[in-house]
Amino acid sequence: MDVLLSLLSEFGFERLSSELSLPIVVHSVPGGGKSSLIRKLINKDRRFSAYTFGLEDCESITGVRIKKAHASIPRSEFVVFDEYIEGDTPPWAFAVFADPLQGGPGPVLRAHFIKRRSHRFGKCTAQLLNDLSYEVESDLADVVQIQGLYETDLQGTVVYYEACVGNLLRAHSVPAYYISEIRGQTFESVTFVTSENYPVDRALAFQCLTRHRSSLLILSPNATYTAS
């Protein structure tokens, strides 16, 4: 356990509980470094193995990677699971990781460790997210713009979560992604197109608002995007 606790401290996770029980529950905002922490853990200590209910890692030259979770994972003492909210985690798991703000079908467990700081996007996005009642921090620089649906050109990767928006974009032959198609992916610049002026579905809206690194453009009916 000491090696995991040491890495959690190194990566800036805040401990919430003085008493720990298995599985150790770790929550992070997007870009908080949880996947990087898991990779460092399994490369540093060969006792550990890692599986994810999200996108698995590509094969590596070391042969060590985060693999896709499946029903027949052999029971072992030091197995960790990423994106645990997305699947059925075995009760013998050593530690489980997730970003609960992105939602998922499974229950959210009480966290032993959390990290609110993102190393993906910047202060402008963090401020917008806090205005929308999500707890996120960042020290980086980025740009956020909010415009009307037809007031400016699209930029970067276009994302949406509402079916009516998808139909509109297809009608105009705009290449775009429903948010579940790109879960776990990051892009330099993103345009989020929505038919509403507030996050109707908070989990899906949060995903759309956190796929970028340097630039986010929100297109909404009245050129506003607020908590309600």
From Swiss-Prot:
Compartment(s) of residence: Host cytoplasm
The question of whether ATP-binding is a record keyword is answered with no
Other remarks in the entry: TGBp1, TGBp2 and TGBp3 seem to act together for cell-to-cell propagation. TGBp1 is the main movement protein that physically cross the plasmodesma with the viral genome. TGBp2 and TGBp3 would facilitate TGBp1 function.
Oligomeric and partner information: Homodimer and homooligomer. Interacts with capsid protein. Interacts with host AGO1; this interaction targets the host protein for degradation, thereby suppressing the antiviral RNA silencing.
- Tell me the function of this protein: Transports viral genome to neighboring plant cells directly through plasmosdesmata, without any budding. The movement protein allows efficient cell to cell propagation, by bypassing the host cell wall barrier. Increases plasmodesma size exclusion limit. Acts as a suppressor of RNA-mediated gene silencing, also known as post-transcriptional gene silencing (PTGS), a mechanism of plant viral defense that limits the accumulation of viral RNAs.
Taxonomic superkingdom: Viruses
Describe the location of the (+)RNA virus helicase ATP-binding domain by residue ranges: 1-132
Q: Give the GO cellular component terms, alphabetically.
A: host cell cytoplasm
Designated name of the protein: Movement and silencing protein TGBp1
- InterPro entries to which the protein is assigned, alphabetical: (+)RNA_virus_helicase_core_dom
Keywords (alphabetical) are: Host cytoplasm, Host-virus interaction, Inhibition of host innate immune response by virus, RNA-binding, Suppressor of RNA silencing, Transport, Viral immunoevasion, Viral movement protein
Which positions are tagged coiled coil? none
Cite a single GO BP annotation.
Answer: transport of virus in host, cell to cell
The (+)RNA virus helicase C-terminal domain extends over 133-228
Q: Does the keyword RNA-binding apply?
A: yes
Family affiliation: Belongs to the Tymovirales TGBp1 protein family.
For this UniProt entry, the molecular function terms from Gene Ontology, in alphabetical order, are:
ATP binding; RNA binding
